[in-house]
Amino acid sequence: MNLPCIVGWAHSRFGKLDSLDLEAMIRDVALPAIASAGLEPGDIDGVFVGHFNAGFARQDFTASLVGLAIPELRHTPAVRMENACATGSAAIWAALDALGSGRIKRALVVGLEKMKIGRAHV
């Protein structure tokens, strides 16, 4: 059995990123990460999203946004992890578990957070 390992990565620029929604943030980071691994989006077997406090996004299942941001991943199984300060670690652990068990061969792990909501509508 091969041990799972990280073979590609990317990150966004740091800052408030007010002009980007979650889909744009996912696309702008996931595509370079996949390319960094020498893969195409269609090579991915499972998507693991670490996203704490989805209430800011007004979207409870943010793992589905990966398929909207990257159409080639639309039918790829995706799950969202939420574990307070360890949310990103939980997403990595879940991907490593799926890889190590042989359930999948290639995983995409996305960690994201946007802690700002739009204007209140009354």
Give a label for each model feature.
Residues 87-94:
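Conserved beta-loop-alpha segment that forms the PLP phosphate-binding cup at the N-terminus of a helix
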